[in-house]
Amino acid sequence: MTPSAATAAKARTSFDVQRVRRDFPILAERIHGKPLVYLDSANTSQKPQAVLDAMDDYYRHANANIHRATHLLSERATALYEGARGKAAAFINAPDPHTIVLTKGTTEGINLVAQSYGRSVLREGDEVLISWLEHHSNIVPWQLVCEQTGARLRVAPINDAGEVDLDAFDALLSPRTRIVAVGHVSNALGTVNPIARIIEHAHAAGAVVLVDGAQAVPHFAIDVQSLGCDFYVFSSHKMFGPTGVGVLYGRASLLEAMPPYQGGGDMIASVTFEKTSYNVVPYKFEAGTPNIGGVVGFGAAIDYLSGIDRAAALEHEDDVLAYATARVSEIPIVRIIGTARQKTGVLSFLLEGVHPHDAGTILDREGVAVRTGQHCAQPIMDRFGITATIRASLAIYNTREEIDVLVRALERVRGVFA
């Protein structure tokens, strides 16, 4: 047995995927009379029963506003909400729960940094550096703040495998580079960026670094202190939690210096018509009544992931991805988009002569859920001279047997368009 085969065999025996699958009620659904094969977790992940139960229990036994009352229900809700903040800090090894800002998701976290930090420090002639791999949420906020400040947006190119050209990235760093904003993992291609190296080189140039971790957090453990990043953002719904909740981790000194992003209740210390003073970090960034039930569910999702052997889960996912890549590549009309040496969770491809949307419709009739389109990453499509791809994206609950179903469904697509 080769080392790679031995590793794959170990992954299949040390990680009990069938036990994990039983934790997710929706995986028992039938779609058009066929068992659901859910291969769209990069879009949004499914939710374990523990998350559903936690949210149900909150609404039944603790539903109240937080930080605003002394009655028991409010105290329960506040404890659950702040407990989730503490869990999030521990989950990414943040130094203190007060470095965790709870947001609506990754998109809001990036916009918050762009408008609160970026708009405060950027001046005409300054530069923000991103890469061609970015999700629109890590492009457009920087375009907006560059338009507002006169700063310039620079973009590091990628090679034909879908990897950032690190020499070109380094060449774009200069004393004018104030902010570097990069994805940890590409949502469209699955490329895992050498993020520690990128952070090190950006810091050497004097830049502050934001990492979009939306596609990384579901797959492997994150340690923001070890990485040394200044900001790290991610979403609950990508990691088995509810929608409408996310995290912005920020270096404490930066968060303290940043002005509020929005005004409203709970982000204030005192208000008069003449002057308002603001609450302490992180509360000055959390205006208004938050998605309390969602945050409670997010806390339960962290508990769920923390109870799993993350290393064994990643080995399992890598095995399924390698199997999927090999099996799908056997189909004569397939073209794989994104062949980086380091990938996780995503297989993006085309079927020659078949529009991805047509393929997606037929796959759905076979019970297979994939995403087709630009994946909120139009520049990547432009880079490869295409308009869209079929994207199969994986999570801890996917299996080799589901990949076999995908391949049979793709053969049916091929037959329809032959």
Protein language model annotation of sequence segments:
Residues 1-418:
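Pyridoxal 5′-phosphate
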